[in-house]
Amino acid sequence: MKKRNLLLVVGMVLLMIPSTLFASGNSEKPQQVSICTPYLSSVTTKQMVEDIEAKLVNNGFTVVVNDSANDNSRLVTDIETSVVSGSSAIIIVSVDPKICETQINEAADAGVAVFGCDAGYIDSMQMNASSDNYQMGEMISTYLFDKMGKEGTFVHLTHRPHPGVVQRSYAMEDVLKDYPNITLISEHHVDVPNQINNSKEIVENLLTTYPEKGSIDAILCAWDEPAIGATQALQEAGRDEVLVVGVDGNEQAIKLIEEGTNFKATLAQDFLGMAELVATDVTKVLNGESVEKGEKYVPALLIE
């Protein structure tokens, strides 16, 4: 009888082991973080996404990266899917939160913490790490207009749907008011992705319209890829008198500056610093700590 009872107890214990292990596995499952961006084709955006992903994985989280490829409706769907799939946090990268404000608010209401990197900020988010884009717009515009001798003509290449880029364009408009002898000939929207080739094509067409040297003195680009495309077009056309500036400080831009091309200056953003700041705050929040909410700026540096 004792032997039979012992066998029954052992059998019950063995039956309990799988379910116990399963329950334990569930409780130890890593929290999921979703990264959502429409601009993974951009060198700098890709750099930030990869840096954030690496740091969060190292901190023990599972990371899912969603690239909506410049499709805002797909971006909205990616955020909604991130909530439904059980993400504990969502990071929007290079996104104006106003585009997806409803989805961000719904995510926050569902208990999902939302963060931004090189994005904008709304109250339902935890924070956004970026450069002070308006200040950078002031810096690069002032640099270029002074470099032009405070007179002449220029063209502006931009992409106003991007929250940081549009702030730089606003700053350019304000700075231009202090330079009455400088004229903005035209502003052009640059397609993303394919921004280098599109910018090159835009400038090639401009050079056809303005074939004489001195008809265009400068091209102000709101970020580096358009400046790279503009520089390529100018070099091929032999228009080495036209000044070009950009923002971001990516490797190809710095190389063109060092080679003495039309590309004269850029502002180097600390994208690694932004990524580190976001990854740190995400980790704190998901570990039950509180963080200071709002915009958090990382300084930029002029390279010429």
What are these regions, as identified by a protein language model?
Residues 75, 129-154, 166-167, 196-200, ...:
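Hydrophobic alpha-helical segments within soluble ligand-binding/sensing domains
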Residues 80-85, 89-108, 172, 192-254:
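Hydrophobic alpha-helical
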Residues 97-135, 143, 153, 250-259, ...:
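Flexible loop/hinge segments that line or gate small-molecule binding clefts
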Residues 32-56, 63-81, 85-87, 93-97, ...:
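Extracytoplasmic "Venus flytrap"
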Residues 1-32, 57-58, 62, 105-112:
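Short, low-complexity disordered leader/linker segments with a strong preference
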Residues 57-68, 154-156, 176-196:
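Short beta-strand elements in bilobed, periplasmic/extracellular small-molecule ligand-binding domains
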Residues 31, 164, 174-179, 270-304:
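Hinge/cleft segment of the Venus flytrap/periplasmic-binding protein
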Residues 44-59, 136-140, 164-183, 198-202, ...:
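Short, solvent-exposed amphipathic alpha-helices that sit
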